[in-house]
């Protein structure tokens, strides 16, 4: 599984079971989902 901070599309990719938008990834206009947030 992927560690916290790793880009993801689904929660089941992540060790912590969370895949969500992180506000810091939205700076510059392009939001991306990462594991663990």
Swiss-Prot record:
InterPro entries: Spider_insecticidal_peptide (IPR012626). Keywords: Calcium channel impairing toxin, Disulfide bond, Ion channel impairing toxin, Knottin, Neurotoxin, Secreted, Toxin, Voltage-gated calcium channel impairing toxin, Voltage-gated sodium channel impairing toxin. GO terms for biological process: envenomation resulting in negative regulation of high voltage-gated calcium channel activity in another organism; envenomation resulting in negative regulation of low voltage-gated calcium channel activity in another organism; envenomation resulting in negative regulation of voltage-gated sodium channel activity in another organism; venom-mediated perturbation of transmission of nerve impulse in another organism. Expressed by the venom gland. Disulfide bonds join 1-15, 8-19, 14-35, 26-31. GO terms for cellular component: extracellular region. The keyword Aminoacyl-tRNA synthetase does not apply. GO terms for molecular function: calcium channel regulator activity; sodium channel regulator activity; toxin activity. Negative results: does not modulate the activity of delayed-rectifier, 'A-type' or BKCa potassium channels. This is Mu-cyrtautoxin-As1a. It comes from Apomastus schlingeri.
């Amino acid at each position: 599984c992927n560690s916290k901070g790793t880009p993801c599309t689904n929660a089941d990719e992540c060790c912590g079971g969370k895949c969500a938008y992180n506000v810091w990834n939205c700076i510059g206009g392009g939001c991306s989902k990462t594991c663990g947030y």
